[in-house]
Curated annotation (Swiss-Prot):
This is Uncharacterized protein At1g27050. The lineage of its organism: Eukaryota, Viridiplantae, Streptophyta, Embryophyta, Tracheophyta. The keyword Transcription applies. GO terms for molecular function: DNA-binding transcription factor activity; RNA binding. Residues 14-24 have a biased composition (Basic residues).
């Protein structure tokens, strides 16, 4: 009995082996690395939707309340002549809105007025101003630039001095060699004209 009591119990106080406590680090596979390194390409945003037939007193909040049930909206605008544009974040939401507008029983309506929803890339509505994002801005900027473009003075074109000299002295260097009746003037007549001009200025002074 004494031998059993004197026997040390080493198993109770010895710590567990490192191999049991920690698992060796396993390097990731090459396939997993390739998947992580590949850039995540986001799908391009779908084209905007054109909403036609809006009432005159329709607001942006009313238009948003009708179309946000089909998906998340990134941009919404109301243009003139009862036309608006709605841009969804996904193509599925835009297709659902178009399908909802084509339902014969319900459709999409504001103030009991049914709306027509089509893609902005539809050739039937491409000529409408402000259909796509930025198209209206480019047109208005081009129109305003044409209307507000300053008129360049004639001096920059080199015409003011010529016009003034032609009005004051019709028989100047520009019309040299041509007489008043359409014939060719001789050097003697041109010298007489110059002498007359000089005498006239001397009399004025």
């Amino acid at each position: 009995m004494s031998r059993k009591r004197d026997k040390p119990y080493t198993n109770r106080h010895t710590p567990a082996r490192i191999s049991k406590r920690r698992r060796p680090w396993a390097p990731s596979s090459s396939e997993h690395d390739e998947i992580i390194d590949k850039p995540i390409t986001k799908p391009p945003p779908p084209p905007a939707l054109v909403v036609m037939g809006l009432p005159a007193n329709c607001s942006v909040l009313e238009l948003k309340s009708r179309f946000e049930i089909y998906g998340s909206i990134s941009r919404i605008r109301i243009h003139k002549d009862g036309i608006g544009s709605v841009s969804y974040r996904t193509a599925e939401s835009a297709e659902a809105a178009i399908a909802g507008s084509h339902e014969p029983s319900f459709g999409i309506s504001i103030d009991s007025k049914k709306l027509e929803v089509v893609w902005a890339t539809d050739p039937l509505v491409k000529w409408k101003e402000g259909v796509t994002a930025g198209e209206g801005k480019e047109r208005t900027s081009s129109f305003s630039s044409k209307l507000l473009r300053p008129v360049m003075p004639l001096r920059k074109h080199g015409r003011s001095s010529r016009l003034a000299s032609a009005i004051v002295n019709p028989r100047s260097d520009n019309t040299k060699g041509i007489s008043g009746d359409g014939g060719i003037s001789s050097p003697a007549t041109t010298s007489e004209v110059k002498q007359r001009n000089i005498v006239t200025y001397d009399d004025i002074v």
